[in-house]
């Protein structure tokens, strides 16, 4: 029976809750994070504390961001960690990680945020995009995600998994798969396989762009029409002559270009923006 109740709490579908309970998987994740006593760690979606407890035992202090009111209250009264925990009851999608970095004076301490969590799969992609905005104040991130999302994060050009999420993630971070996790490690068991990924923000961006909007825009337009040649998919942004001058094969498709190519296209658009552009539009995060 795949019960939705675990440790007295019923998983809430609207929060995408699946609670990790497999001890060997938990140990593997904690070993990958390798928390140290004086570091500033932030857990997103601590849930019932499967990762909170073993990490909390190894550090001096742990900040957790939890949207579920009942779970946040449980953590505030945790039997042996409550004095170590700062519980922030809010939506991680709206949370200002930069303000936390400033509030804790981490720059003066020579530290950055170390972020980890078992992310709700229904918001994992937009949450990743939110976190990338704070790449300069984050030391590293370790996340449990849907296995297919991890494949996309780690993908190389010329593969089916390669897409906008790949480019945006690898633009900001070095991305490494850590371990795969079966559905049986959770309660209730999800219908998909999971995996843990490590993201380490680049100290210096290898392919900096002048305006991130244009990197998002060109990737969205290319991958939303990934079966088309770039000559056709990007026709509203570039003439064939422009693409050729930028070293782009007109018959190539979205997955054939490296991050450096997309950065070059984005920088050209920053200098030569189309007249009818609306930079306030919301870019589609799907591919």
From Swiss-Prot:
One of its GO terms (molecular function) is 16S rRNA (adenine(1518)-N(6)/adenine(1519)-N(6))-dimethyltransferase activity. InterPro entries: KsgA/Erm (IPR001737), rRNA_Ade_diMease-like_C (IPR023165), rRNA_Ade_Mease_Trfase_CS (IPR020596), rRNA_Ade_methylase_Trfase_N (IPR020598), rRNA_adenine_dimethylase (IPR011530), SAM-dependent_MTases_sf (IPR029063). SUPFAM superfamilies: S-adenosyl-L-methionine-dependent methyltransferases. Keywords: Cytoplasm, Methyltransferase, RNA-binding, rRNA processing, S-adenosyl-L-methionine, Transferase. It is an enzyme of class 2 (transferase). GO terms for cellular component: cytosol. S-adenosyl-L-methionine binds at residues 18, 20, 45, 66, 91, 118. GO terms for biological process: rRNA methylation. It comes from the Bacteria. It catalyses: adenosine(1518)/adenosine(1519) in 16S rRNA + 4 S-adenosyl-L-methionine = N(6)-dimethyladenosine(1518)/N(6)-dimethyladenosine(1519) in 16S rRNA + 4 S-adenosyl-L-homocysteine + 4 H(+). The keyword Magnesium does not apply. Its EC number is 2.1.1.182. It is found in: Cytoplasm. Belongs to the class I-like SAM-binding methyltransferase superfamily. rRNA adenine N(6)-methyltransferase family. RsmA subfamily. PANTHER family: DIMETHYLADENOSINE TRANSFERASE, DIMETHYLADENOSINE TRANSFERASE-RELATED. Specifically dimethylates two adjacent adenosines (A1518 and A1519) in the loop of a conserved hairpin near the 3'-end of 16S rRNA in the 30S particle. May play a critical role in biogenesis of 30S subunits. This is Ribosomal RNA small subunit methyltransferase A. The gene is rsmA.
């Amino acid at each position: 029976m795949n019960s939705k109740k675990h440790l007295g709490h019923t998983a809430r579908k609207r929060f995408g809750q699946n609670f990790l309970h497999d001890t060997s998987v938990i140990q593997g994740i904690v070993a990958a994070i390798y928390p140290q006593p004086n570091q500033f760690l932030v857990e997103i979606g601590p849930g019932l504390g499967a990762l909170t407890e073993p990490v909390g035992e190894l550090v001096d202090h742990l900040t957790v961001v939890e949207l579920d009111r009942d779970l946040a209250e449980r953590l505030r009264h945790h039997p042996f960690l409550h004095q170590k925990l700062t519980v922030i009851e809010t939506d991680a999608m709206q949370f200002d990680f930069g303000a936390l970095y400033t509030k804790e004076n981490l720059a003066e301490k020579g530290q950055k945020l170390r972020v980890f969590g078992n992310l709700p799969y229904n918001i994992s992609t937009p949450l990743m995009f939110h976190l990338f905005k704070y790449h300069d104040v984050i030391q590293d991130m370790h996340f449990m995600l849907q296995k297919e999302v991890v494949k996309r994060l780690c993908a190389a050009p010329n593969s089916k998994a390669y897409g906008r999420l790949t480019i945006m993630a690898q633009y900001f971070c070095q991305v490494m798969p850590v371990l795969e996790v079966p559905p049986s490690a959770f309660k209730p068991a999800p219908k998909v396989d999971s995996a843990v990924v490590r993201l380490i923000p680049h100290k210096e961006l290898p392919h900096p762009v002048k305006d991130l909007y244009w990197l998002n825009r060109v990737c969205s337009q290319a991958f939303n029409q990934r079966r088309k040649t770039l000559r056709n998919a990007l026709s509203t942004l570039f003439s064939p002559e422009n693409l050729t001058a930028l070293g782009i094969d007109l018959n190539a498709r979205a997955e054939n270009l490296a991050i450096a190519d997309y950065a070059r296209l984005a920088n050209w658009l920053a200098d030569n923006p189309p007249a009818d552009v609306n930079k306030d539009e919301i870019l589609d995060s799907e591919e």
